[in-house]
């Protein structure tokens, strides 16, 4: 607890504000600023908290310096959440000290994976953190490069869920989406960088106390702090804060306020007020500094992840809390939140599933019958809702914000990805159906509103059955696939030819022969 020898009433009140953990961080930090301006001498009669954090950090920084001394660079994976920010603070401090001591440094990287479906409310925050980082790197002349990576097209949520119809990740299902959207792109980038600059050690901010499930998995893998580990694929990694409590995380970020004489480190962000403010908003307005790992509210422990993530259950508590605690700032996300809740509600609605499988037994020619994918009608419905939300946001932007939108759920590239998947799997009744929906909603004024959400009752998934396709479908054993004409429609092609339109040709993916394809114009 901080104390002062001053008998001045204002000084005593300011010290009481600093010591009051129930007050928002911004209020307490403002108290620090005023105390500093007034040149009031204050001391901590229990300095152990700050000293413990410094001792903990120094141990980790020395471990990271030791990695650099082996000639290996650091590759820090960041989401700019509280844990990865801690790892970045520690890594940058280690890099600064190494360069100061030796006059050079191995090439290091800060890597962020843009899934393209993050919470739109965090866009400004991500941009601010990235700008702060790049200014810090240039100011200190560090050989550190910020790299933003993206998942492969076939892993994009729009292609996988709206295009192919693969079910989103619901509670109890594997989280392979996280691997496809974040882990794989980062690992791919690090392998490419290692070939150019030498071996890299990944700095990862996972902590055992985030959840019991996480803790068990980390123990089974043999994860320990401050030791260079070898992953399953041979990737070298170090987990600096794997044994930290959430209090340690918030303490470090709090003590990295460059405006305070009490700052532990002057890092890439002048302060982490923005980080704390975001977590507070997602925690129903309560100060994140007062919430621990055990017994914490769900929002503070929640991930600021994908806007359509359904793993957390029937509600995205983090997003809901942001909207409810600061409606003036985040109410524009209410429609997106409702879309997410709608997707959760239709999980067990078998009438929204596609029953016919997409692969067959080459020996027997039988196709599986089991409802494991969204039907085309459901995918089309979801796309219409998303495009409607985009159109409404654009209307607001044109009227109130100089045409600058706050989010875009479906961009042009994603439309093409959806149409590609619909064409490959013969889902839509005609070519470029997704582009047509975009045109009708954005240019012709059509709107599709999400109605009352009714949660379908849980049902067992019917057992897999098999069906033999009619002989007329002509299954080719040579090509091991069902013949499809794709974009080739003889009637449309002939009509276009009679109208004097030049007919384009494409090379068939399977026969390698050229063929005419239908002309489509919006």
Name each model-derived stretch.
Residues 2-75, 84-522:
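Nucleotide-activated chemistry modules centered on ATP-dependent adenylation/adenylyltransferase
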Residues 81:
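Catalytic cores of secreted/periplasmic lytic hydrolases that degrade extracellular macromolecules
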